[in-house]
Amino acid sequence: MVSMVIVHPKKDAVDDIVNLVNDSRKDGVPGLEVYNIINSNDEELIFINFWESIDAFVEYINSHHNMIELIEHLCVRIDEENVSKAYSGPLLYQSN
């Protein structure tokens, strides 16, 4: 199971966001196998998370560890309700 979250950091907030996310995950997150943080050329931060199962992913979204709630004050809002675009689904292929 893979989830991807895209946010647009406020000016000079990239390092703060990365540090907050890494600090919140330093002791591990149940079911999170690997995560990557990418700073794109379009002033976006892209988080790619690999989960052991959909259940682990859903549990995380509903927990107090929810990444979006942690960083939303450092992000530009997309609309009234959202600071991110999020996608999730099964991993169909991964090369070695």
Segments (PLM) and residue ranges:
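Short hydrophobic/aromatic beta-strand micro-patches
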Residues: 8, 48-50
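Short, low-order "capping/linker" segments at domain edges
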Residues: 86-96
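An amphipathic, aromatic/His-enriched active-site/gating alpha helix that lines ligand/cofactor pockets
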Residues: 26-35, 50-84
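A short beta-turn/loop motif at secondary-structure boundaries
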Residues: 37-42
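Short, surface-exposed ligand-recognition loops at beta-strand->loop->(often short) alpha-helix junctions
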Residues: 6-18
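Extreme N-terminal starter segment of soluble prokaryotic enzymes
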Residues: 1-4
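A generic structural motif
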Residues: 43-47
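Short amphipathic alpha-helix segments
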Residues: 16-28
